[in-house]
Amino acid sequence: YRSDTNPPPQLVMDYRSRLEDSDAMFLISSCHNLRMNVILENWIDWVLHPTWFFSYKSLLPDSKFFGNYGYPVAGAMKNKIGIVSMTYGGPMVSYFNFSFFDNIPYRRLKKSIFQSGGLKTKYLRFYSVLPNMKKVDFEKNMQKVRKFARSL
């Protein structure tokens, strides 16, 4: 995909200009089967795209075989805050076994996207966020949100 050959839609450009004017980007999503909401995944693919969000610098630009190998260079969102908040539909113990892997959405976002764009990552996670949540659990979650917001 080359944005100079096939420019993104105006809506994507509008999101990008709003992000350029902001201090932080806050992404919130539910997590199903270790995947974020499809709409958010698609938004990330469109908006946080090279060369606006990051670009690559080749280690060996003149090499026929290794010219594509290099490292990311942060773009428009460099040194801003990227906040991810996800709700998991079950108790923490059911996701604990997967938490060591890089396949869970938060780690995938942090390592492959946010770090490429130079964002400082913050994370807010919830477990057992269901429609029939007890008031005590809801208040505990809201305390986490308040503490998190004050830390920014």
Predicted regions, residues:
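N-terminal beta-loop-helix "entrance" segment that forms/cooperates
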Residues: Y1-N6, V136
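Glycine-rich phosphate/pyrophosphate-binding loop and the adjoining helix
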Residues: V93-L152
